[in-house]
């Protein structure tokens, strides 16, 4: 096998069980396979949805890497030293696979890389620049702050749970604690909840929630 070595409990993150070069063609092929799978699952390339997880670590045979898509922006997060060093190759592969639909790549790994590696990584754009994309999930619109927000800016992996809440929300009172972007709140409102309370201790998060509400056409 071949993979990324790193000091710690996980010594090697395996990229391939066959002796193949980890070159530009490798990254393009892995990302292409992941993208085609998302289209098959109707997570990508469909109306009323421009937000999805393109790369989910081991699930896409790229352990240590997470890439979330928000409209025309890819937010890349490395959880291993090897992925950090490959970030520019990965960025070029993203551009090759996604083409003109990709306008920005933001690298956000300062808080996810092992501190013992002492890499001095800084968050920033690898491609494109300052932009504010509106994330659309199942027709609902959200303001995503991938620079200052938690994780990559939005909890993309909670899509099914948000939809489930919408199904059960009709005529109910809903309390959304630690609401962050208000994802669950908006789904509950669209589902017919009588009242929805969104609570978060962070003033920044509360402001983001308010901006999402003002994005209009949410309901």
Task: Name what the model sees in each region.
Residues 1-71:
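Non-catalytic accessory regions of SAM-dependent methyltransferases
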Residues 23-49, 76-119:
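Cysteine-centered catalytic environments shared across enzyme families
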Residues 58-62, 66-68, 87-154:
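Non-catalytic substrate-recognition/targeting regions of SAM-dependent transferases
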Residues 72, 142, 161, 178:
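Conserved hydrophobic/aromatic pocket- or pore-lining residues that grip, position, or stack substrates
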Residues 157-169:
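Conserved alpha-helix/loop element of class I SAM-dependent methyltransferases that forms part
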Residues 167-211:
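Conserved SAM/SAH cofactor-binding pocket of Class I
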Residues 212, 216-219:
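Single conserved hydrophobic/aromatic residue that forms the stacking wall/gate
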């Amino acid at each position: 096998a071949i993979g990324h070595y790193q000091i710690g409990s996980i010594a090697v993150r395996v990229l391939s069980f066959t002796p193949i070069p980890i070159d530009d063609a490798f990254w393009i092929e892995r990302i292409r396979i992941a993208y085609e799978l998302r289209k098959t699952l109707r997570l990508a390339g469909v109306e009323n949805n421009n937000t999805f997880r393109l790369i989910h670590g081991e699930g896409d045979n790229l352990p240590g890497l997470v890439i979330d898509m928000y409209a025309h922006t890819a937010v890349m997060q490395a959880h291993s030293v090897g992925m950090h060093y490959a970030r520019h190759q990965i960025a070029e592969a993203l551009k090759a696979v996604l083409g003109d639909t990709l306008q920005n790549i933001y690298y956000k790994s300062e808080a996810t890389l092992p501190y013992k590696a002492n890499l001095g990584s800084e968050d920033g754009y690898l491609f494109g620049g300052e932009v504010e994309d509106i994330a659309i999930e199942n027709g609902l619109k959200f303001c995503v702050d991938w620079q200052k927000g938690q994780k990559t800016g939005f909890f993309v992996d909670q899509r099914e749970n948000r939809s489930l809440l919408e199904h059960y929300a009709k005529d109910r009172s809903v309390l959304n604690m630690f609401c962050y972007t208000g994802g669950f709140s908006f789904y509950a409102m669209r589902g017919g909840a009588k009242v929805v309370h969104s609570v978060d201790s962070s003033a920044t998060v509360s402001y983001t929630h308010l901006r999402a509400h003002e994005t209009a056409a949410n309901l």
